[in-house]
Amino acid sequence: MYIANLRLQNFRNIPIKSFDFKNSINFIVGKNGSGKTSILESIYFLSHSRSFRSSQLNRIINHDSDEFIVYTKAYNPDEVVISLSRKKNSNNISKLNSEIQKNHTEITRVLPIQLMNPESFNIINSGAQQRCKVLDWGAFYLDKTFLKIWQQTKFLIKQRNSALKQNYPKAYINGIDKKLCEFADILDYKRQAYFIKLKPKIYEVLSQFNPDLKLDIDYFRGWNSHKSLVQVLEESFDSDNRYNVTNHGPHKADIVLTINHKPIQDIFSRGQQKLLICAIKLAQGEIHNSENENKCIYLIDDITSELDNTHTKTLFSYLKNLKSQVFITTTEENKIIDFLDLDSHIIEI
């Protein structure tokens, strides 16, 4: 997949604008506040039906309007047209090839996105939920049945927590547990299947950034690996009931990053953590591209401020080898001169 044209109308500070892109590395150059990140945000919005910058979606609509529209013409290799619009205090309206979508799942599947921005580098310190999203992104594209299993598991955990808060009888909660454990085991299997592919690829990519960086990468399914979830939920029932929350299960899954059994955030420098996140994101894209004709698109916001010149060069080299379409924002064109080639495309904002 690559985006050939993007049209924005009343999106953030862009009243109306059309952009043409290449199926290569596209550099978006402009001053702070010029709308560079808004272009990345609009592409991300097309894929996910949400923003990576704000949960207040009405704020995305230009203050002089009551609706924004994002439209793109992409190729995979056939032409694909995706549009998304939103009026103030209303819901998003998504269209794929002019057909209104009941949900956004198919568009997300058609338009796979990897985002790398300053907030991405907080994955290591943000808790298990953010790291688990790495697994779920990959499993979603690897296995078409994953989403339904994930949704059903999430529903059952929510139902169980609600039952705990309302002091439902234990027999009722046991009924929920039976269904939950069935779906949790399937979800665990699918996450593990992706993790088995991801782990060696992370090591491979990380070695290209810094061969001296060593760490252990392990998968935690969310409960004791030596016990069934049925047993764990039974043993933890009194505690769960006391605090009105399910403390064990697939919602607690994690990618555990350690050195000598110590969390890497206590050992890795900020710079080393950035390299690890780059390796994770690139590994995900490489796995995706190797198993899908529909290649992953990278959105990279102001990466030159996060990495030094040597590691930025390694990143660009790897991205070129992935043959993914890439969008990179920067405030200073002179910072990217060393990385330009005949296939590069510069858009000045």
From Swiss-Prot:
SUPFAM superfamilies cross-referenced by the UniProt entry: P-loop containing nucleoside triphosphate hydrolases
Gene Ontology CC entries for this record: cytoplasm
Keyword Iron: no
Binding site for ATP: 30-37
Domain of life: Bacteria
Main location: cytoplasm
Record-level GO BP terms: DNA replication; DNA synthesis involved in DNA repair; double-strand break repair; SOS response
InterPro entries assigned: DNA-binding_RecF (IPR001238), DNA-binding_RecF_CS (IPR018078), P-loop_NTPase (IPR027417), RecF/RecN/SMC_N (IPR003395), RecF_2 (IPR042174)
Protein localization: Cytoplasm
Annotated keywords: ATP-binding, Cytoplasm, DNA damage, DNA repair, DNA replication, DNA-binding, Nucleotide-binding, SOS response
GO molecular function annotation: ATP binding; single-stranded DNA binding
NCBIfam families attached to this UniProt entry: recf (TIGR00611)
Name the UniProt record assigns to this protein: DNA replication and repair protein RecF
Organism per entry: Francisella philomiragia subsp. philomiragia (strain ATCC 25017 / CCUG 19701 / FSC 153 / O#319-036)
Biological classification of the source: Bacteria, Pseudomonadati, Pseudomonadota, Gammaproteobacteria, Thiotrichales
Gene this protein is translated from: recF
